[in-house]
Curated annotation (Swiss-Prot):
The keyword Ion transport applies. Produces ATP from ADP in the presence of a proton gradient across the membrane. It comes from Prochlorococcus marinus (strain MIT 9515). This is ATP synthase epsilon chain. The gene is atpC. The keyword Membrane applies. Keywords: ATP synthesis, CF(1), Hydrogen ion transport, Ion transport, Membrane, Thylakoid, Transport.
Amino acid sequence: MAISLKVLAPNQNVYEGDAEEVILPSTTGQIGVLPGHISLVTAIDIGVLRLRMNSKWTSIALMGGFAEIESDEVIVLVNSAEIGSEINTQNAEEALKKAKSAISKFPENEKSPEKIKALNEISKAEARFQASKN
């Protein structure tokens, strides 16, 4: 028995297909989904969705959104997403280093909008880098 998975971003159908297992990065932690899962709507954090089909894992970098789980169907609506195999690992790693370097100019206790944006860029770059490695 398989789960029907759709990952949708504005103007883009990122992924549509079956999966035996889905792991979602929710704002409260990872959610593992198997066939027959209880109904659930959850916020999706910046992170990596992992799906397993035929013993093969696929990663998708997600940039925040929502997911609806209904028995054997998962619909993920996100701001943007990229399939890991389509991300250049070297470019993703360089973007992560650049994002980490940008945060170093802020004092540790600062809570400015600029620092929050820089931290968000680190999260995005980390998600892309992690997804690119799988």
